[in-house]
Amino acid sequence: MTFDVNFRAGEYLVEAGKWEVPHLMEHVLLGANELIPRSRDFQAELEKNGAYSNANTSVYDITYEIECADFEWDRVLGLLLVAITKPLFLDEEFAAEFGNVQEEMAARSNNHFRRLSLEMRRALGLIAKTDSERLELMANVTVDDVRQHYIRTHFAPNMRFVIAGNLPASRRASINKLLEAIDLPKKGRRLALPIERPKRLNRPVYVANDTVENLYFYIDTFIKRRLSEAETDALSLINTILTETLYSKIFGTARERGLVYGMNSGLSYTRSASNWWFGAQVSDKNARALLKITVDELHKVFSGDITDDEIKVTKQYALGRFQRSAQTVGGTAAGYAGRYFFDGEIENYYRVPERIRAITKRQIVEVARAMFADNIWGFGTLGNCGEVFAEQLREDIASLWST
């Protein structure tokens, strides 16, 4: 069984100087509580039959996750609910987790893709701070800040959950009873997502790092609205065609020419905008060639240069990937949680194959063009290539927004 419990309680809800409050709260909450008043003892009881627990904090949310064997679902769920509803937030455990979070932030700061992504996000007008900034701000946070943030955010209407596993009627009834009786305040409503308005960057984001031999880059483009379900499906399919396999149009071509080891792209959303991004780590000498392939293949999409066979083959790939994702309880839970925790929409999982089959070439071309039509975009690099070369790379891709 998998239990994911989510609260709209992320960093956007605290003042900038107190940025690390939600993250520290998440670390301390799955610890000492009224039932078991010591963190190590609580974790020992929770995990004694092999259960796994974790939690994560983002700009928007905090999610608590537990996965356990089927035979102990009720015991483990009970412990999770006690941790969420009866935390003690002890001074000594806060001090210990303060040190652990410092170590976590220091480790994260070595992830160059993450560093560039955060610098890009902030430059584009979205809510973000780098890990090094977060480390500096940690000293502003007290255990009282954590307690107050818990009170402001952990109330029943602000909670969402996804539970996956063997769920016969009797078990569903028991779970419903537990959740309906949860000992959290019942007044209020789900906290709203922040309003973020991405903006066009007129120069590249350049993060100098002389220790990096290759350069890391990201391309971000935005449309000033949320995509429809059909548009999202179509954009996901062309994203697969372009970068997600070793035979894809951009990544596959670049690999065939020996230009890059790996490349990624994907979709993301804010409350009122949609984002399509591309990123890779590549040597300076191959960077312009890789970006030329990217630009050329995207222009082909804009002009409708996609064959029916390419679409058919990619649909088959997408169908298989979907089925594979639903083969575990964790995969099934993740399939529901992404959208539900973000905007409250419960997707009909059984319709996904039908949606994939319904994607048309016209939809693909239209949504790909639309993602570049608002001329809101940015380009960023991390490495030691220099600002002049970074600007040259930006100029190499600028034609994508003049179609």
Regions found by a protein language model. Give the residues of each.
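Catalytic core of Fe(II)/2-oxoglutarate
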Residues: 247
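Active/ligand-binding-proximal structured segments within catalytic/core domains
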Residues: 1-46, 219, 229-242, 250-256
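Charge-rich, well-structured scaffold segments of protease-associated domains
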Residues: 32, 40-190, 196-197, 206, ...
